[in-house]
Amino acid sequence: LMSASAAYVCQDGGDILEIGFGMGISAGYMHSHSINSHTIIENHPQIIPKAQEWASSKSNVTIITGNWYDVKDSLSTYDGIFYDTFGDQDMDKFSSSLNSLVKKGTRVTWWNNNPNETNFYNIPDVAYQTLNINPPTNSYFNSNKYYLPKKEF
């Protein structure tokens, strides 16, 4: 899932915004692509040091600490955006903030916990790539299909 998400947002290289570092899996996949810069916003106090340590060996990574919504006005525009914060309670804020973060051709995706292609987030013209997966039995995601949202501006 994270590999496919990274491949989509990094397809054209450029400047990438990742909202939510988590375990750093997607960040690692993003760096398997040729990207100019990688801006990561992380809010969780236990994850911030892990993100900073991960980024310390990379010259093109900037870690911004805090809530993404509180810092959004200081951000630039990006060629790719991956939104993966804990829970989806801020997706409406994210969808209404996208226009200030994108330019022509920007690719956007997000963690989609929905079991189908339903677009609950008021983001028009979203395509979905169906991925066949085999999650571990003890995983919180227990479907054999994942619907990767793809939005290009």
Label every model-predicted segment:
Residues 1-14:
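Conserved alpha-helix/loop element of class I SAM-dependent methyltransferases that forms part
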Residues 15, 36-37, 60, 107:
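Residues at the starts of beta-strands that form the adenosine-phosphate
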Residues 12-24:
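Conserved class I S-adenosyl-L-methionine
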Residues 37-42, 110:
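Conserved SAM-binding motif I beta-strand of class I
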Residues 69-81, 85, 89:
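A short acidic, Gly/Pro-enriched loop at the edge of an enzyme's catalytic core
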Residues 41-75:
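S-adenosyl-L-methionine
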Residues 46-50, 54, 89-153:
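C-terminal substrate-binding/active-site "lid" region of AdoMet-derived donor-dependent transferases
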Residues 23-35:
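Conserved SAM-binding loop of SAM-dependent methyltransferases across substrates and taxa
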